[in-house]
Amino acid sequence: MVFSAREIKWGVAHIYSSYNNTIIHITDLTGAETVARTSGGMVVKADREKPSPYAAMLAASRAAQQAMDRGIMALHIKVRAPGGHGPKTPGPGAQAAIRALARAGFIIGRIEDVTPLPHDTTRRPGGRRGRRV
């Protein structure tokens, strides 16, 4: 299929990937209008499977189908980890979600990491002597 640049409808895929879950949220370019929203917990039964790459892949393909039904043909991708004083690296589902969106037939524009990084952080929980286990 050949499209002119004017005909292609772009969207933004916000992928939040932690070590507990993966959330895929597809919006229009402004980010104001939600097109599709799914998570790893919506597609698997067991809680322990929520953060898995397989759950992220299923969630991404479900979100991709909903977005294509709404006419979106191309995506910019924003990947986010918990950040702040949590982990600064995305969880195991981020890579699988990006790959599933690409396989679904979208044109992929920019892939960007939007993890919030503190410039001078708030104090970590646990106190002066740390968490005593």
Swiss-Prot record:
Name the Pfam families on file. Answer: Ribosomal_S11
What keywords sit in the KW lines? Ribonucleoprotein, Ribosomal protein, RNA-binding, rRNA-binding
Keyword Ribonucleoprotein on this protein?
yes
Q: Extract the coiled-coil ranges from the record.
A: none
Q: Which InterPro entries match?
A: Ribosomal_uS11, Ribosomal_uS11_archaeal, Ribosomal_uS11_CS, Ribosomal_uS11_sf
Could you give a GO molecular-function term held by this entry? structural constituent of ribosome
Top-level taxon: Archaea
On subunit structure and binding partners, the annotation says: Part of the 30S ribosomal subunit.
Q: Which family does it belong to?
A: Belongs to the universal ribosomal protein uS11 family.
Q: Which NCBIfam families match?
A: arch_S11P, PRK09607.1
What is the recorded function of this protein according to its Swiss-Prot or TrEMBL entry? Located on the platform of the 30S subunit.
Q: Identify this protein by name.
A: Small ribosomal subunit protein uS11
Specify the species: Hyperthermus butylicus (strain DSM 5456 / JCM 9403 / PLM1-5)
